[in-house]
Amino acid sequence: MKKKILLMMSLISVFFAWQLTQAKQVLAEGKVKVVTTFYPVYEFTKGVIGNDGDVSMLMKAGTEPHDFEPSTKDIKKIQDADAFVYMDDNMETWVSDVKKSLTSKKVTIVKGTGNMLLVAGAGHDHHHEDADKKHEHNKHSEEGHNHAFDPHVWLSPYRSITVVENIRDSLSKAYPEKAENFKANAATYIEKLKELDKDYTAALSDAKQKSFVTQHAAFGYMALDYGLNQISINGVTPDAEPSAKRIATLSKYVKKYGIKYIYFEENASSKVAKTLAKEAGVKAAVLSPLEGLTKKEMKAGQDYFTVMRKNLETLRLTTDVAGKEILPEKDTTKTVYNGYFKDKEVKDRQLSDWSGSWQSVYPYLQDGTLDQVWDYKAKKSKGKMTAAEYKDYYTTGYKTDVEQIKINGKKKTMTFVRNGEKKTFTYTYAGKEILTYPKGNRGVRFMFEAKEPNAGEFKYVQFSDHAIAPEKAEHFHLYWGGDSQEKLHKELEHWPTYYGSDLSGREIAQEINAH
């Protein structure tokens, strides 16, 4: 009897031990295993996940995110994860290849920027912004790294809120049973971001100096969202002493504008700092791009918020001191694309430059797809125009009921599609006309005339695509009418605009935002 009782007790003990093991396993399995790319993504994701998951980071401190390439081990980590979160394809350029290589369909892939439009980055040749309602343009570039679009959105607290919201929404959709916790965690984290945003706004909205000079042009969104101007300089790094020639030119530049600080992405070596101070009369300071924190720094309590507040404190060394407006060392705005060229540079073009199937952007203006563009333009104008005013202006410019145009360069035909009805005409080249705009920049209209006597309103057409010589167009503004070419030359307010028919509305919005 005793043996039976002991056997029963043993079985019960084993059963409870097994139950406990199972419970622990279920608890562990209930946690979402998330792999992130680099520090800001890790930080934001942890803010959303809380205690409902295990969040890891591929790139350790000291790794350059722009140059990172995942190892086979890294790819396996992603493969074995429940979710993979990254910032943007313009930052982690390798992600598209990794997506294709994944064999597991269970991995939820989250893009931090979501549908956020980005501004132009280095490598994007056609950057312009409309500064005066007559297509004034401005080129943007970033020192050191080559991006079609600038991915450094996390350096603006205002935009970081959107990144956290995107991560929250994607993970909540993938794990509905945890959505309530994710939303609560995100709400707490976003409140902290809103406080940081308020601190930046309060400190910088009335800045005495609106421009700051940096060696690492990663702070474009921060500058845009808080009313500042980021001035990027070349030929200066935190660990290599500038050449004598560079010191000489930098010294002149610093003295011309009374520049007191040049910002680096990390502490400049003592030798570089001393050289800058002695030879150029300027101090070196650090604005962290927040691409990584060491374990030691994190254990010491440093995080996104402490570093961003330190950045603000350092930035105020410049913004709190009144001074003259600081301009870039070189004026990069007067390019051909922006409307500055010599007459002899203008060459004849053929209709084949515009061959293809093209769609009007007007429907995307109407359905709100382009709304982010107007917000960006309003901020770039620094109070000159509101987002609503920009939308009204472009509504007039883009408005058309010709939703599609098909151009056959070989046959020299243009097919206009209106409400599904097609009209095709054959065109001959009629020359070019250089127009001068009120701001002093210029544009070229390339003119064509229909052979058919019944072409009506499509008798005369003029292309404008910011190019002045033969090249394949990426988009264009088109003017048409039945009276004369001369009458069309006077049309400056209405310029129906067309992009490739293979592009989505968001892709078109992104291209427009980079112009």
Curated annotation (Swiss-Prot):
<protein>
    <recommendedName>
        <fullName>Zinc-binding protein AdcA</fullName>
    </recommendedName>
</protein>
<feature type="region of interest" description="Disordered">
    <location>
        <begin position="125"/>
        <end position="148"/>
    </location>
</feature>
<comment type="similarity">
    <text>Belongs to the bacterial solute-binding protein 9 family.</text>
</comment>
<keyword id="KW-0864">Zinc transport</keyword>
<dbReference type="Pfam" id="PF09223">
    <property type="entry name" value="ZinT"/>
</dbReference>
<comment type="function">
    <text>Part of the ATP-binding cassette (ABC) transport system AdcABC involved in zinc import. Binds zinc with high affinity and specificity and delivers it to the membrane permease for translocation into the cytoplasm.</text>
</comment>
<feature type="signal peptide">
    <location>
        <begin position="1"/>
        <end position="28"/>
    </location>
</feature>
<feature type="region of interest" description="His-rich loop">
    <location>
        <begin position="129"/>
        <end position="148"/>
    </location>
</feature>
<dbReference type="Pfam" id="PF01297">
    <property type="entry name" value="ZnuA"/>
</dbReference>
<dbReference type="InterPro" id="IPR006128">
    <property type="entry name" value="Lipoprotein_PsaA-like"/>
</dbReference>
<keyword id="KW-0406">Ion transport</keyword>
<dbReference type="GO" id="GO:0008270">
    <property type="term" value="F:zinc ion binding"/>
</dbReference>
<dbReference type="InterPro" id="IPR006127">
    <property type="entry name" value="ZnuA-like"/>
</dbReference>
<feature type="binding site">
    <location>
        <position position="66"/>
    </location>
    <ligand>
        <name>Zn(2+)</name>
    </ligand>
</feature>
<dbReference type="InterPro" id="IPR015304">
    <property type="entry name" value="ZinT_dom"/>
</dbReference>
<keyword id="KW-0813">Transport</keyword>
<dbReference type="GO" id="GO:0006829">
    <property type="term" value="P:zinc ion transport"/>
</dbReference>
<feature type="binding site">
    <location>
        <position position="152"/>
    </location>
    <ligand>
        <name>Zn(2+)</name>
    </ligand>
</feature>
<feature type="binding site">
    <location>
        <position position="216"/>
    </location>
    <ligand>
        <name>Zn(2+)</name>
    </ligand>
</feature>
<feature type="binding site">
    <location>
        <position position="291"/>
    </location>
    <ligand>
        <name>Zn(2+)</name>
    </ligand>
</feature>
<dbReference type="InterPro" id="IPR006129">
    <property type="entry name" value="AdhesinB"/>
</dbReference>
<dbReference type="InterPro" id="IPR050492">
    <property type="entry name" value="Bact_metal-bind_prot9"/>
</dbReference>
<keyword id="KW-0862">Zinc</keyword>
<dbReference type="InterPro" id="IPR012674">
    <property type="entry name" value="Calycin"/>
</dbReference>
<dbReference type="GO" id="GO:0007155">
    <property type="term" value="P:cell adhesion"/>
</dbReference>
<keyword id="KW-0732">Signal</keyword>
<keyword id="KW-0479">Metal-binding</keyword>
